[in-house]
Curated annotation (Swiss-Prot):
Position of sequence motif PIP-box: 57-64
Organism in which the protein naturally occurs: Homo sapiens
Binding positions (ATP): A463, F464, A465, G466, T467, G468, K469, T470
Superkingdom as given in the UniProt entry: Eukaryota
Cell inner membrane in keyword set: no
Lineage: Eukaryota, Metazoa, Chordata, Craniata, Vertebrata
Name the record gives this protein: F-box DNA helicase 1
Amino acid sequence: MRRFKRKHLTAIDCQHLARSHLAVTQPFGQRWTNRDPNHGLYPKPRTKRGSRGQGSQRCIPEFFLAGKQPCTNDMAKSNSVGQDSCQDSEGDMIFPAESSCALPQEGSAGPGSPGSAPPSRKRSWSSEEESNQATGTSRWDGVSKKAPRHHLSVPCTRPREARQEAEDSTSRLSAESGETDQDAGDVGPDPIPDSYYGLLGTLPCQEALSHICSLPSEVLRHVFAFLPVEDLYWNLSLVCHLWREIISDPLFIPWKKLYHRYLMNEEQAVSKVDGILSNCGIEKESDLCVLNLIRYTATTKCSPSVDPERVLWSLRDHPLLPEAEACVRQHLPDLYAAAGGVNIWALVAAVVLLSSSVNDIQRLLFCLRRPSSTVTMPDVTETLYCIAVLLYAMREKGINISNRIHYNIFYCLYLQENSCTQATKVKEEPSVWPGKKTIQLTHEQQLILNHKMEPLQVVKIMAFAGTGKTSTLVKYAEKWSQSRFLYVTFNKSIAKQAERVFPSNVICKTFHSMAYGHIGRKYQSKKKLNLFKLTPFMVNSVLAEGKGGFIRAKLVCKTLENFFASADEELTIDHVPIWCKNSQGQRVMVEQSEKLNGVLEASRLWDNMRKLGECTEEAHQMTHDGYLKLWQLSKPSLASFDAIFVDEAQDCTPAIMNIVLSQPCGKIFVGDPHQQIYTFRGAVNALFTVPHTHVFYLTQSFRFGVEIAYVGATILDVCKRVRKKTLVGGNHQSGIRGDAKGQVALLSRTNANVFDEAVRVTEGEFPSRIHLIGGIKSFGLDRIIDIWILLQPEEERRKQNLVIKDKFIRRWVHKEGFSGFKRYVTAAEDKELEAKIAVVEKYNIRIPELVQRIEKCHIEDLDFAEYILGTVHKAKGLEFDTVHVLDDFVKVPCARHNLPQLPHFRVESFSEDEWNLLYVAVTRAKKRLIMTKSLENILTLAGEYFLQAELTSNVLKTGVVRCCVGQCNNAIPVDTVLTMKKLPITYSNRKENKGGYLCHSCAEQRIGPLAFLTASPEQVRAMERTVENIVLPRHEALLFLVF
């Protein structure tokens, strides 16, 4: 192929080139003389090309081992653009047999091992390179018109390097000055031109380095410092020896490593952190433990190039800088007036400790990223990890420090290391199914998608609320489109919705629908299927003579329920409950004789239920849980699937787990272990009980922002001691202090409270439009009316022609009436009917009018409703912009600093189900959460009182300021530097705490040693200490005495 012709430049062309950026960026391509600085840009007469000479100078430093090339222009002798004075030697190689970027292998010597030959710095001339020259392919600066660009991957071999002629440079100069590059929009990031990153220009013979291994170790360390520790150890350390050495270096991100090792309870890490706390006076007995934390942080080493004045200038816009400066100046003057200027890390630590939200930490990072700042982000990140691990350890040691500070740091660092916004673009996982929306996957989701299921594997995905577990399964099924999957869940509506979003290689079913197809259909064809659950009323009618009664019938029902939920093949005495309620409503232990009678009656009842013949007794009909049990006992085979997805795995019963685990294919259990709210149905948490081969976590919620995420994480932290994995949200705004806007969801624990709220919001001249979750029919307003009719005297029923529609309730008209019905409900422990009876007794004669009003205000489309009402059980899986948590959940009676007045209260006294219900309610919110006073009290158990620091000089501008605590008479002292202010908050009962300034004594009672950032211990101790009087509602006081 012919070589391209040189372009002859006119004088005008030379003037354009002299003014272009190429004259600056390519200084080696210009002739510099004393007379004419643009002399090298003039046209050069065509001369005969001479033979190439052997060049000896090499211009790339030694640390660019993999990319070293022979220089083709001796700059000391000639800097002419059109000459090439270097020649390659035949047979020389550019790569050594084993380089520092080779993959680690067992038994292989390291890069510095004895006997390893020094790497050759030459290369051989290849026919491919000669072809590139012949075709005019330009690879200057790494941009090739003929071949695709490199990708940021780590291959074991390097791409062959092309040789560049001097004519290529001249050709490109003319093309860039007068022509538009058509491929400009398609090229990727520019490769590295040389070891000086092109700042000194590039030579015509020199090819740009485009391989990540060509980066210096210092640059790699800087890049790796931004990655999660899990990625560094599980993935990057396996790439090559060089990367492993960088990651294993004890001087590389030491605090980040120590933080994660401490969370894992590694013995050496715990010992090291404990030693730091002890040696630096960061102990529970020390009033100055927080100030000592700042002092220790100030010892953090930083680069010699750090200019404190420039860093301070970068922080000038941070809202907490004046408070931080005042704190350090007053309490740590030696760090503020140091010889080299103010200690920057002391100011950073003070800002972090005074921060009241994640926004304060994010603003701090933003300021320190400014070009005017001389600190590096790895140094800042290391400092934050240092503070984080010490704060975490302080809480472990019982020091009264708020978990909010650690949460703020963790949240920012998590987003920095895992958020998609940290990279220019995160690759979206393409959908192979037409019409499916492409979504961006998080780092945690991508780890799951990369796992290939094998037979008999058991994978657990522990997913917090709103973390996209369903979308993760959808993307998994799309990626592994050649496999067949079975998606199973418990809720029919969820299964229907799954059918619409999953690809065609996934079959979506409920467990009961599969059992119905194999077993239940047979009973339906014989009209022997009970559409409702077995009740003590049904069972009582078939018990043996002399052994009846609703209490014994309840015992038999519970025995059968335990058997249906278990994986056992035979019904035994072990299925009989240990405890029951007697006729006086007291909880007593079941006697052995009652156990034997209970298992005998339950076995007889189960035998009659299994028969396919006709039956006259309602109790002998097969139930849904009954035919599911029969299907489990038949040992079904699901061998046609490659893997089974079990959604909401925390609600699995042992019977269901037995069905799934007995299959030969792979199993994926997905769920949130903290959303287990169906233990009363015999559910056990499969995410804890089932042994696994692999476990993954989804911790970042797409549903809500930081404030709501903090409340959910604190409930798990304080009430369930969950600290190893932390719930985080997104970067969008969310509020928890009572700012309700637009549509509001009112979530309750019981149906009785739902009815109360429906009555309240539909009152007045302009009643609100409401929507009951699950529909008005499922709420049971008809049964409320029937119970009210049952309550009316017989004469009144006849007079008003009142007819009870419900078959079961109608039976009590001719039995014992309303009083007998109520006794039965109490003995049967039927919570649903108990709630309805409570509603009827509370509103009595108003029931018909209230039910009619609720039905009139109810609309089916929730998008047009002003209020959405329902219980947490029905709201599970849903989400709403604003959630209003009602006041019938588990209660913490007072704030932490007043709990010593209630010695009988224990968080551990309540079951996990109660805390799970509250957690589910809170995590339904997307934008705003309206809390109860009890929920705020839970946050105080973690040290969060919604306080923010202000300069005392600003507080006292208007005169004397009193403490906002009602029973406190202290005033804010003038000689203190900072004062804490309680932020206002509106509770779900519409009461408002307007907040205000706290005296330093009251602040110390609430936030402990953090108060000594505002005033000295002597000043705080000199103030009068106020003890608040706690007045509890009578029923709550009795409850705490009982427990």
